[in-house]
Regions:
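Nucleotide-binding/hydrolysis machinery
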Residues: 111, 115-119, 188-191, 266-276, ...
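Acidic catalytic/metal-coordinating carboxylates
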Residues: 36-37, 63-66
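Flexible nucleotide-interacting loop at or near the entrance of a catalytic core
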Residues: 110-170
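The feature encodes the CheY-like receiver
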Residues: 18, 60, 84, 88, ...
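Conserved post-Walker A coupling segment in P-loop NTPases
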Residues: 154-219, 230-246, 311-316, 364
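Active-site residues of response regulator receiver
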Residues: 56, 84, 241
Length: 394
């Protein structure tokens, strides 16, 4: 913590927000200046440099992301806190890639913002790692709910990293989407992303699926097979439902994570690989460890960074946007015009508990696109198992 009073500057075109932040920072005994545009801030930096900068993303003239890029070259040790009302995954990742100290979606708790300024002022500086922009299309992720914003922030913080990640959450919450986004915003973005649902393959076949086999390794092994680890070399391997893996395969997986090498089934030569592993589960792995169903050492290897995907019932404010997005996607698949929802239908779907989470919602939009007559979906078009009032004769 610096011995002098912290000097925090604010850039935001919202006068009321500037006033609230200035007041809170001054009450915390900090010095502050505020600017309506990034260009005005850059002029002021010729005279003085603050300890911390708070900037909005979308402003007239230069954006907050463009400002970050400018500051990264000229003032690499200046901690920047990015605030935005347009809080999506792309903005979060762009902010962290640009070197932001933290990303704070609006509306935010003013005390949290003041605490972040204190933390940022204690930085020793440091230059963020360069990360290549992904060449592939980014996985579609939608969410304004606080729980989803935390997911976006976690992905943004990990941009530039190849750390092992454990994604937890109920079935259908989009764990593979999170894994793809982590890959797309990592240094491995231009390398393979290989996904495998370990619970969908019989245990006796999973070993060969993961590690491959040599010709003649077992009955029916007529040729050499390259496994998923080799396919993912240089890139990312996503292992879904890791909690269902047999003890024997857990041991083999642990060795790969520890030594970055493995043997094909029936093979004699060790094969070196460079693979980032992202695992996912809908189980409580800590409990599975206590019950001796999951190796404790493997659990700690996988649980380096954890991201939890929230169930849809905990992010009801996102349901209208999700419905609109996936209704449009379903219409595109069918080659038809997108359907909309009337107010009663929207209310029915927004209050529905969605036990199958986003996966169930996606399937529901396809179903409604096919079965609902006309271009506007009413509550009468929605089946009762989705919270609607569809008559049994429809």
């Amino acid at each position: 913590m610096p011995k002098h009073s912290i000097n925090a500057w604010i850039v935001d075109d919202d006068q009321s927000l500037r006033w609230v932040l200035e007041k809170a920072l001054k009450q915390a005994e900090m010095e502050t200046r505020s600017f309506e545009r990034a260009e005005h801030l850059l002029e002021a930096l010729g005279e003085d440099v603050p300890d911390v900068l708070i900037t909005d993303v979308r402003m007239p003239g230069m954006s907050g992301i463009a400002l970050l890029d400018r500051l990264r070259g000229s003032y690499p040790d200046l901690p920047v806190i990015v605030i935005t009302a347009h809080s999506d995954l792309e903005n979060a990742v762009a902010a962290y890639k640009g070197g932001a100290f933290e990303y704070l979606p609006k509306p935010f708790d003013i005390d949290e913002a003041v605490d972040l300024v204190r933390k940022a002022a204690g930085l020793n500086g440091g230059t963020p790692q360069d990360v290549d922009e992904p060449t592939g299309a980014m996985a579609s992720m939608i969410g304004q709910a606080p729980a989803m914003q935390e997911v976006f922030r976690s992905i943004g913080r990990l941009a530039g990293s190849s750390m092992t990640v454990l994604i937890t959450g109920e079935s259908g919450t989009g764990k593979e989407l999170v894994a793809r986004a982590l890959h797309d915003h990592s240094p491995r973005a231009n390398k393979p992303f290989v996904a495998l649902n370990t619970s969908a393959i019989a245990s006796e076949l999973l070993e060969s699926e993961l590690f491959g086999h040599e010709r003649g390794a077992f009955t029916g092994a007529d040729s050499r097979r390259i496994g998923r680890f080799e396919q993912a070399d240089g890139g990312t391997l996503f292992l879904d439902e890791i909690g269902d893996m047999s003890p024997e395969l857990q041991t083999r997986l642990l060795r790969v994570l520890a030594e970055s090498e493995f043997y094909r089934v029936g093979g004699q030569a060790a094969i070196k690989v460079d693979v980032r592993v992202i695992a996912a589960t809908n189980q409580d792995l800590a409990r599975a460890v206590k019950e001796s169903r999951f190796r404790e050492d493997l659990y700690h290897r996988l649980n380096v960074i954890r991201i939890n995907t929230p169930p849809l019932r905990q992010r009801q404010e996102d349901i209208p946007q999700l419905l609109q997005h996936y209704l449009a996607e379903a219409a595109q698949e069918l080659g038809s015009s997108p359907k909309s929802l009337d107010a009663e239908a929207m209310e029915a779907l927004q209050t529905f508990k969605w036990p199958g989470n986003v996966r169930q919602l996606v399937n529901a939009t396809r179903r409604l696109t096919v079965t609902a007559p006309g271009t506007v979906i009413s509550a009468q078009d929605i089946p009762s198992d989705l919270g609607g009032t569809e008559s049994s004769q429809q």
